[in-house]
Amino acid sequence: MQIFLSTSPLDEPSAAKHTRSIAHTAYRIGPGSTLLRQNLLQSRGGLLSISDGDTPPISDPAALCAAVKRECSRREYSGVVLDFEKPLRDDYKPFVRQLGEALHAVKRTLFLPESCAGIAPGAVVILCTAISGGSFREYLEGAVKRFGPEHIALDAQRLRMLFPLPCPGGEGTPLSAAELRSLLANSPSVFFSPELCCRYFTFPRQGRTCFVLFDDAGTLKKKLDIAETLGISTAFFMWPEVEDIAGEIGW
């Protein structure tokens, strides 16, 4: 399994102690379809990761694609991650399509969110592992049937979620690392869900039962193992989420 650590310039020195496979989360799209970069060490290799925070309209997708290609060549990046979290805008689509074509021509890989699947044939779709219902294996099996294992990468999010019971809408509340530690300090009985491939426990609060799902090093490794059996060979971790368990996961 090829593991990339998604890392900001500030955190890169600590992440680089564990791997040279870094997705550099230092880029965003600026006015006039420009590529903006934060202060970044003169590192080489890894991936160029572009966020969609405060992105103005992409009026010249060809110019933006050319800028991305130049940066990939200059820093020897092997591919590009489109870290788009907002709903896909129409002006993104020509850029995504042209970037996919441009990177394919120079044998570089484009990783993109599921919302962009189909826009750039041959790109790799990033799937989130933090599911809270159903079967994790069946979730991946369905994706493999849709995209093919060679066109899937995992966004290995470290799940920390609280659900009040009953929870008809299935909407949980994210927990910070400190909040989860505080709840675990009360020594609840913790169980493993083979279906969800994560750990869970319950506790009472204000007359209701609360249900907590969470990942640790063991469950994250198990998710990667399942993915490998299905032919999926790439995964991403957000470095701040796994810094405390990096030695246990191993890369």
Give, region by region, the residue ranges found by the protein language model.
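A structural motif corresponding to the C-terminal end of an alpha-helix
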Residues: 74-77, 102-110, 143-151, 222-234
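Chitinase-like catalytic core of GlcNAc-active glycosidases
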Residues: 1-135
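Short acidic, glycine/proline-enriched helix-loop-strand junctions
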Residues: 92, 99-108, 192-200, 204, ...
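Glycan-binding loop/region signatures in secreted carbohydrate-active enzymes
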Residues: 151, 155-223
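Acidic/aromatic/glycine-rich contiguous surface patches that form carbohydrate-binding/processing clefts
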Residues: 223-251
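Short catalytic/ligand-binding loop motif for oxyanion handling, primarily in non-cytosolic enzymes
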Residues: 89, 119-120, 161-165, 243-246
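Conserved, mostly hydrophobic/aromatic
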Residues: 22, 82, 152-154, 227
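A general structural detector for well-ordered alpha-helical segments in enzyme core domains, enriched
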Residues: 64-71, 95-99, 139-143, 171, ...
